[in-house]
Amino acid sequence: MEELIKLNFPKSVEEYKKQSEELMETYDKGLKEIIEIPKEKRTFANTFEATDKLDVKFRNIESSLTFLANASTDEKVRDVANEVEATLSKYSIATSMREDLYQAYVDCCKQNNDFKESDLSKEQLRYVSKTLEGFEKNGLQLPKEKREKLKEIMTKISDNSIKFSKNIADDKTKLSFSMEQLNGIPKETIESFEKDESKPGNYFISLKYPDVIPTMKYCTVAETRKAVEFANGSKCIKENTPILEETCKLRFEAAQLLGFKDWASYKSNYLMVKSNDNIQSFEERMRKLLTPHAVTEYDRLKQLKKKIYLEKGGNPETYDDHYYSYDNAFYNNVMLVQDYQVDNNLVKEYFPFEVVIKGIFNCYQELLNVKFTEVPAYQPWHEEVKMYSCVDTADSNKLLGHFYIDLFPREGKYSHAAVWPLIPGYERADGEKQYPVAAMLCNFTKPTPTTPSLLTHDEVVTFFHEFGHVMHNMSTKVHYSMFSGTSVERDFVECPSQLFEFWCWNKDVLVNKLSGHYKDHSKKLPTDLVERMIAAKNLNVAIFYLRQIQLALFDNAIHSGNPANFTNTADLYHRIATDVALNPNQKGTNPGCSFGHLLGGYDAQYYSYLYSECFSASIFEIFDKHGVMNKELGARLRNQVLAVGGSQPSSETIENFLGSKPNEAAFLKTIGL
């Protein structure tokens, strides 16, 4: 199994540091051999390909040493994995700025006339250009003094990112409420909350998704919602405010050293969008389009709030006409029930976890010609962790890869939903092969003593989305690890996973593939209820997308221009929430401090979610026309989009599949505008 999985989690805390030191020594030795090759003897194979082989070994061990920072139940393991991640990150930054290594690649290109008349494949030529680009992004063209300064800045940014994420994962905030204060929250949901033993009858609400979301959605007590939202918006505010604000300043400084106006200009230069001007015009265009619709939606929600207040005998003279941020989820849900008769508590009875996972797996298996089989989990980090093999049913059941799933919340675990590509997959021309391994971490509703884990429809959508990332990794058919799976431009990486969300809104899929009542799996979601769910899909959709644009604009604002131009991130966040989302967060909060994307790889790139939805909607139009379970289309999707990873520009990938350039029309159509 170890031969296939290529992971080896250390058995003790001491092993982490020992293995990380050995890893750096081995990598240095390998680089030395590449650097010492005489200039006249340099070839693609002994310089570029040799580096990829070295990188693969480094990355495999690095995953083994750092991943458990996100998942281990042992705080000591999480801490040492974070320490090792900081050490390896510092080492990687220094390596990516080595002049002698860069010179080896430059010499190789010169020796081979920039490979202009070579028989290198398109992917090999891309490997050359991306390797050189990586060094140039790290300032190898700068004088030594500036390079040293840049290295110092990049190392500090990396350290800050690790601390920022760790603070969010380690948050232990919980608030105690009586049953009266939790009025409206379903009984079985309250049963899943931790009991407050010091106050009999009280329950704790943590800031994890399965606690916060039902509270904001169902609790009739506005003061409870206000308190929970305030705590959530203040998560890590003390620890992460200085980290976030310092990082923004450091990024600006780094961008200036590299010859860019600001960090957003630097990042966008290497993405599909090409420039920060294009990001800002895209966001502004979408904002203008959505705002009038959102104003209408807010008016309806305000009227509903007042109507309910008066129906309960409230005094019109003392009515508070404000519509607060903690009102949103609650009145949206009331409207869903009143206007569409969609009760999410009833809906989730038809989504028991074991039915949903089987259904989602079946959809992916049927559509993409693959098969998943549970296998004994290799070095599992928790008893709930499961592992599956993935084989290609269209090609003699050949193994494609393995994936882990770890789906329920626990202390110290990564608190959102994400997929880690632990081991890159590739097959070289000489037959050398490595199978990909991915890990999917989520925080779905846990089972209670009386009911199994029942997923909300939103959680079903999240599962489908994240599993799209898993399949992007499993489907990889590239020659070089640099291009494996989700190693694509950041503003394309969400396209496949967002595409698969559409299956969660298909009537046949919902009824026949994903649902089965938890008391009797043969009882499917009633057809009329599904039709009402689909009809309500775009309920208050403009508000939802304005919120996405608000987050993208906040991300863009802190990375555009000089950070000295804004006083602090809390004020900036509040202003953008007021002006853009039309619904400000509570004063005294700063949700930017727990906005993991900002220091988790989406810096100046949060626009990517909405941007890539335009691509996924364009692809889904074809499935919608020819059938969502069309195997021929599924095979095309797997081979033309998922399998190619980053081995070609993503603009080429999307145009190859569509037969034309994507546009925003398909997306606007899906949201009913």
From Swiss-Prot:
Gene3D superfamilies linked to this entry: Collagenase (Catalytic Domain), Endopeptidase. Chain P, domain 1, Neurolysin, domain 3
Superkingdom of this protein's organism: Eukaryota
UniProt entry tagged with the keyword Heme: no
MF term (GO), any: metalloendopeptidase activity
UniProtKB keywords: Hydrolase, Metal-binding, Metalloprotease, Protease, Zinc
EC number, as in UniProt: 3.4.24.-
Positions contributing to Zn(2+) binding: H465, H469, H472
Any GO BP annotation: peptide metabolic process
One Pfam entry name: Peptidase_M3
Active site residues of this protein: E466
Family: Belongs to the peptidase M3 family.
Protein name: Thimet-like oligopeptidase
